[in-house]
């Protein structure tokens, strides 16, 4: 609503030369804006809904404003969509997916910003050379659709881009930051070697016995690789382990490589298949409907909220296995989803409204997630401002749902890399306050995982990552 108000209101638009949004609406939201006026009254009285269309009920009067918004977004002379990505494979795939959603809606004026590109190092620093090689390989293999988009590269800065002063410095390319004594500052801050690593985390998990291990955190922080490393290490120790993902990009297969270690079962919760199965059940339960009602219910069921509920049911079935085995999940429900499900009875009412009964696995899920002996939630972050802030918000969401995280994993840290590259040395120094904040204020337990020159792939590399 606020978005359309800014974009479609002539008085607001006339006050500014440029209006910059740091986040665009999703393709699903834009599709909802183009729904016919008829949906409004139907959703208000719909007893079959399983999605988040409800809050839009009664907004029929603003339909013209929504239509104008979609038209403005599709006008290349007035709107530019800027896709922002790190020079990493997973981030580039996500940028391509988001761009495709907008193109399907006729929003084609797109640009790509590659953020954090490291310049080719002049010296022989192995860490810097490896980082440049990884970035170049990601750009070589990036989705073809992004190659057609005008692209700008923003260099990896020695300092973090937080605060007005730092943002102004970004535009002053001739300005250089003093790097004197960077290494000394890093080592003097604290003894990095005293912070436990992934090997210690695996030992703690193993000692506590079977249960659920959930990786949660911002996209792109390395949840999939960490989940794979933990699962492979536990299987290598002789335990039965089920590693599951809801990641549509199948990053888990890339992390594990071709061979699956003995004792490890790998599965994928397919959101599309689960949503299809759930939607069919809802439609069957709804019974005979008029053509318009059925069409609107079907659109209702295309909502991301429907997918959340469907995936949540599959997630509950997987968690049930942890009574006897280790179950490692590389992508858990978001804190927002868990908050929506905070009161178990609310979710039960939703299921009863759409299905008539509550599966036993679902009924027992929230108590299991709240049991610290059964479920270990690991918040994964990078030692940077935004990932730490997002993990902190996620922790607050979980706590409001009476779920206490087991600890935090700080991933891909340059502190232990041994780099002598000036830019990377200062980046390492910049990690210190975030590592200290996590360890001293945010986390009950924390572990530090170094940045790796090559992405750990396959059983041996993952075992080495876990100290086995």
Language model region names:
Residues 1-97, 288-386, 390-393:
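Phosphate/Mg2+-binding loops and adjacent switch elements
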Residues 25, 118, 248-250, 333, ...:
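Short, glycine/acidic-enriched loop or turn micro-motifs at the edges of active sites
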Residues 69-213, 370-374, 382-468:
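C-terminal lobe/tail of nucleotide-utilizing enzymes
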Residues 1, 250-302:
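P-loop NTPase motor core
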Residues 23, 32-37, 218-274, 341-345:
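Walker A/P-loop NTP-binding active-site region of P-loop NTPases
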Residues 30-35, 96, 124-125, 165-166, ...:
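Short acidic, glycine/serine/threonine-rich loops at helix termini
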Residues 20, 112, 241-245, 328, ...:
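Short beta-strand "acidic-cap" motif of Rossmann-like dinucleotide-binding folds
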Residues 5, 100, 228, 232, ...:
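Short, well-ordered alpha-helices that flank and scaffold nucleotide-derived cofactor binding pockets
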